[in-house]
Amino acid sequence: MLSRSHSNATMSTTRHRLLATASRFVETLESLDMDAMLAVRSSTCLHHMCCPSFRNYSITNDQTREALPQWKATIKKYKFGVLDDSQTLVDEQARKVMIRAETAAETTVGDYNNEYVFILRMTEDCNAVDEIWEFYDTIRLRDLRHRLEAGHVPIGVDAPAPFTTTASPAAL
């Protein structure tokens, strides 16, 4: 959960709304509730995976909805949250929040832990996420990908977003 240590009296309304939306984004990722995850996003939200070793690509809300069930099927236990509140950055003018996050999951092929940096651009009213840039440790993901392959769990275009290695035709 993002720290709310700043006094509401001293925090600008824009900053408060940006942080509140970022906090909702984190909470919905932890919940893995698809409807909640999409509710915090604008209808035109694009999610950019920014890791060249897995090929950069972007996915829409519809593609996220298609991919999540397969990802959830590999998870037994899951935890996601902000790694370090002190590294959260807010750019009010650009309506962006950067967070450093971590995940710990028990999957069908063993433990998976990773760190992420998310840059979230919010809508004009700051109440929804309009664009997401996600950066993650590709070595850790590559290890999980190899374990999934060895376990004959689908990867590639039809795999959940974190394991997709090429853009789907709709994303091109």
Curated annotation (Swiss-Prot):
Pathway it works in: Secondary metabolite biosynthesis; terpenoid biosynthesis
UniProt record, GO biological process: terpenoid biosynthetic process
Lineage top rank: taxon: Eukaryota
Misc note: In A.calidoustus, the austinoid gene cluster lies on a contiguous DNA region, while clusters from E.nidulans and P.brasilianum are split in their respective genomes. Genetic rearrangements provoked variability among the clusters and E.nidulans produces the least number of austionoid derivatives with the end products austinol and dehydroaustinol, while P.brasilianum can produce until acetoxydehydroaustin, and A.calidoustus produces the highest number of identified derivatives.
Subunit and interaction comment: Homodimer.
Family statement: Belongs to the trt14 isomerase family.
Name this polypeptide is given: Austinoid biosynthesis clusters protein J
Species of provenance: Penicillium brasilianum
